[in-house]
Amino acid sequence: MTFELGLNYWPRRRAMYMWRELDLAEVRDEMAQIADIGFEVVRVFALTEDFLPQPLTVDARMVDRLVQVVAVAAEAGLRVVPTLIVLNMSGRIWWPRWMLDAGGAPVDLYSDATALRSQALLVRTCAEALRDAGGAIRAFDLTNEIDDAQRPPSRDAGRGWCALLGDTVRRAAPGVPIQIGAHLPSLSANNNMRVDDLAGIADEDLMHAYPLYCDVARSFLDPELVPFSCALTAGLAGTGRRPLMQEFGLCTAPRGSAGLTITDDFLGQARDQYLASEDEAAEYYYAVLERLVRTGAAGAYAWCYADYDARLFDRPPLAAAIRERTFGLVRADGTEKPAAAVFRAFRSRRDAGAVVQGSVPNVLDVSADEYYRDPATHFARLYSTWCSASSNGGDGA
């Protein structure tokens, strides 16, 4: 199996406003740059606010734009992972107005009949529109970190919601793999989106991990958290599949500046965040990629393509979430940061046969049920063991 290189994508001049302000020429240029760096997959996001503006109403214009973006990516030789239910994105929850009551409280995504039917209609419509895309669709990702938008009220609710959407996509686009965009709370908290439950619905086991958002990480630049999270995901899934790191990355300080810590807004809470120097970011990406290969990951999707144009800084989410402005491998002016060269060199080595994946370490020493009785304690305990083994020259197992 070849280690897969992917990139999460929003355009640098449009960010989350890409669908309502779509510039296909801009997307075409950026997809060409993404392919040139060495990526083979792009993950894009059908923002629910744009695609589902009313109950039981999918905006056909937005679906057509998604089809066009997939076609443009395919022209560049890229395959696409469309994420279909996107409420939580880049430090903001993008609720469609109809999902909020007069007091601003959201509908129950997991039990409200109209909300469920509407979400199922959206994923079905997108899957049907793209099922004949000539192999351009790498997979359908059902959702992005949905529990940050609204935590399922129970394990059964989370599992049932994913199963409904997964079954809907499978009927609409048979044979296309299904992913579910999960993040660290599925490993470290009782968020009712258990990895073993997701593994029974999806065709791939995957995770998002950032030291920036993890109190167990040893530093903002800790290179072990991502490979550990990947290996733990594989252990909890219990499928024997190689795990995919669907999101990892870090934000950077301005070009030529040293790294600095800031206090930033994280979904309404103040949190320290680190803007790495561009050289630190390159070193981090190199270290994490090498560890992911050594510990048997299926691949890695960096977050994200580009920094955003300063003209977007007075609009949500970038007006409040400062870190989200500069997660890119490419600067807002289109020039590449040193981290882009890390991926370009990695792709060259991979294609030359110099990248050899190891086996996934067995890090889990309890059953999934036992683990989820106290996930925070087990996560910290197992990570400590992993780091101790790594410091002694092992692979964390």
Each predicted region: which residue ranges?
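Short, solvent-exposed beta-strand-terminating loops
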Residues: P82-I93, G249-G259, G299-L312
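Glycoside hydrolase catalytic-domain groove-lining segments
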Residues: G160, L164-G166, A173-F266, V293, ...
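Active-site mouth of glycoside hydrolases
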Residues: M1-A202, G240, D309-L312
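Histidine/acidic-residue-rich catalytic or RNA/ligand-binding cores of hydrolases
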Residues: A253-Q269, E280, Y284-Y285, L312-A320
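Aromatic-rich peripheral "rim/lid" segments of glycoside hydrolase catalytic domains that contact
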Residues: M18, M99, Q119, Y284, ...
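Amphipathic alpha-helical segments in well-structured domains
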Residues: V63-L66, G158-C162, V226, A281-Y285, ...
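A short acidic, glycine-rich active-site loop
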Residues: G104-R117, Q269-E283, F327-A332
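Generic structural signal for well-ordered alpha-helical scaffold segments
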Residues: A127-R131, A231-A234, L289
